[in-house]
């Protein structure tokens, strides 16, 4: 379950949505394929990403797959059709939108790869984190933790994380965060300036 599912449940979806099953990230077993699908067959275990664009769309081909067909229209599950919480669901452009799961990866672990990991990593890519950068990650829920991991993998020399929950701080430390800021203690920027001798940071990833 993604936090976005909770938001949809309590606050509503983007636009009018009625009688639609939630869920937009997960793993599944293929039960049937269309006649144009070449890379998958019934019985395959697959990873389903949150974004499943139409890859022949102009937006996807220009690098904006999440906006394939319109603003956030690449996010199809539980927005334009039933999501992955249903027993059976349809995946468009299967050859481009599915990934085959190796036998040695269980589905529980693999589910993290469909949205949380790539979202956090993509935030780090968009921030253009470089070797030696000091990076601030705001929010250390699942996506923020993956942003910390991504910044560490790209060679950040120092990672400062904003968050208060002890369990999240412990996990963030395991992924490479060295220092922590609490929004409960006042201005985040002032705390960061104080711990960096007024230098601030090179890159910021917003994940909260």
Protein language model regions, located:
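NAD(P)H dinucleotide-binding glycine-rich loop of Rossmann-like/cofactor-binding domains
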Residues: 54-138
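Mid-domain Rossmann-like dinucleotide-binding core that forms the NAD(H)/NADP(H) cofactor-binding site
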Residues: 100-186, 190
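Glycine-rich beta-strand-centered segment in the early N-terminal region that forms part
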Residues: 10-61, 82, 102-104
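Glycine-rich, N-terminal phosphate-binding loop of Rossmann-like dinucleotide-binding domains
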Residues: 50, 184, 208
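N-terminal Rossmann-like NAD(P) cofactor-binding module of classical short-chain dehydrogenase/reductase
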Residues: 47, 202-205
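Buried hydrophobic positions in well-ordered alpha/beta secondary-structure cores of metabolic enzymes
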Residues: 5, 28-30, 43, 57, ...
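A glycine-rich helix->loop->beta "capping" turn
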Residues: 195-203
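Short N-terminal strand-loop motif that marks the start
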Residues: 1-26, 86-89, 93, 99, ...
